[in-house]
Amino acid sequence: MADIHILVADDSAGQRLDAYLGANDGCPTRSACAHLIEGGAVAVNGETCLSKKCAVRAGDRISVDLPEPHDPTDVIPEAIPLDIRYEDDYLIVLSKQRGLVCHPAHGHESGTLANALVYHCGIDHLGTVQGEDRPGIVHRLDRDTSGLMLAAKDDDTQRALQNLIRTRTLDRRYITLVHGHIAMDEGTINTGIARSTRDRVKMAVSDDPFARQAITTFKVLDRFDSTRFDDGYTLVECHLFTGRTHQIRVHMRHINHACVGDPLYGKCDARADQGLTRQFLHSWRVAFDHPVTGERIECRDELPWDLAAVLDDLAPRSLGRTAAGDDIVPQLGLLEA
């Protein structure tokens, strides 16, 4: 993603957000900006704004996440298997496997989740609020993060689901294993997150006025004893109240407990990383009120084999589950649960 930061001048106050952005150098056309706004790519004073009609005010700090440019191409249907956990006429809940990119970008023009969704649903039966190259995509998971995701079959449903994220009523829970022992059994991390000024591939905790607010709560499920090769581990459930790029990975690094196996924010020590070649991070539970039917939807997803194998190996080193761990760990599909 490319970032654009704009400070609204006095003489621009009162303009519609899409019109204001469309007239700024570095931003695309007004209609393209409207799509970016509706897709959750625009923040005003650190908060995502989904209304293109919102009037800007003098002194507003606006951040725009522009997709990386790539050659325009139709998203070609590809028969990539989808692990669907719930589906109706409006939306899909699926489990994304590790290694699967969500949508086409440079270096990944095919073989993405978007290609699979077009094959499964047809391009005319997917929401395009996020852009023609991101059909159906409501929110993203990093390539090597596995687990539950949502896809929408029309624009109205896509907007409604993104609004659940904006209003923090889409309940998303992740399981991660981190280095070291987190001292407290639960906590909240509330910071700004912005692109790193040292490495543009990374995100970082930031107090920059243009940083976007990121809130993660966590509960410790289990701790595992240390050895001469590592500092021990903590198994954690994280609850996302916002959806910033790399949010959990950045927040865990911020409290000095990086996700095991994380190639960007972790230790990059094969032995300490338990042989993992990707971050130990899995979207295990989503729950929300269906935006059309009102039905309560809740899906859970056991850990994939590579992550489960790590925990099975660590089980003899357990220092004792917490009360939250007694409730959650048996639902993760572990041999030792």
Cite the ranges covered by each PLM segment:
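Short Pro/Gly-enriched beta-strand edge/turn motifs at strand-loop
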Residues: 64-67, 198-202, 213, 265-271
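RNA pseudouridine synthases
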Residues: 1-188, 192, 197, 300-316, ...
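Short coil-to-beta-strand transition motifs
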Residues: 75-79, 206-216, 280-281
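Pseudouridine synthase
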Residues: 109-121, 153-157, 166, 191, ...
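Short, acidic, Ser/Thr-enriched surface-loop or helix-capping motifs
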Residues: 37, 215, 240, 290-291
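Conserved hydrophobic positions within beta-strands
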Residues: 84, 178, 218-220, 259
